[in-house]
């Protein structure tokens, strides 16, 4: 069964581009333009195997969204993305439990490496 990845980015081109790319690799996707729209969709949160979240969103920012997700879900795997990230943002993302912090424009090979790594670690026997 294909894994479902949720993309949250207020830039339509990034959001749809990532969703289309992920679908072309066989993943199911849900895409949201705001933190609030995702938090209002229990089904999307419950079925997500991974979250890709932009830091700068209208309304609640991506870090705050990830904090909300960690309160609702047990260790949600998240990749945080940002068009203007710095070292303090990178450290904060990892402190929150993100599996990666990627600058925009996203290097697709690196993105898929993190995704494959996350999904293979979940599939490995404990």
Where do the protein language model's features map onto the residues?
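Two-component/phosphorelay signaling modules centered on CheY-like receiver
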Residues: 12-30, 96
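The feature encodes the CheY-like receiver
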Residues: 15, 55-58
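Acidic, metal-coordinating helix/loop segments flanking the phosphotransfer/catalytic sites
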Residues: 31-50
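Acidic catalytic/metal-coordinating carboxylates
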Residues: 33-34, 61-64
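Short amphipathic alpha-helix used as the core "switch/output" element in two-component signaling
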Residues: 63-75
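Alpha4 helix (beta4-alpha4-beta5 surface) of REC/receiver domains from two-component response regulators
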Residues: 64, 85-100
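C-terminal output helix
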Residues: 88, 106-116
């Amino acid at each position: 069964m294909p894994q479902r990845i949720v993309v949250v980015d207020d830039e339509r081109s990034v959001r749809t581009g990532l969703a289309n790319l992920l679908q072309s690799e066989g993943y199911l996707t849900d895409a949201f333009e705001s933190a609030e729209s995702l938090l209002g969709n229990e089904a999307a949160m419950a079925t997500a195997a991974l979250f890709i979240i932009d830091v700068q969103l209208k309304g609640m920012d991506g870090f705050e969204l990830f904090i909300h997700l960690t309160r609702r879900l047990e260790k949600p795997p998240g990749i945080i993305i940002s068009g203007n990230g710095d070292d303090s943002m990178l450290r904060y993302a990892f402190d929150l439990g993100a599996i990666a912090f990627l600058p925009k424009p996203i290097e697709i090979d690196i993105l898929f490496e993190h995704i494959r790594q996350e999904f293979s670690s979940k599939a490995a026997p404990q």
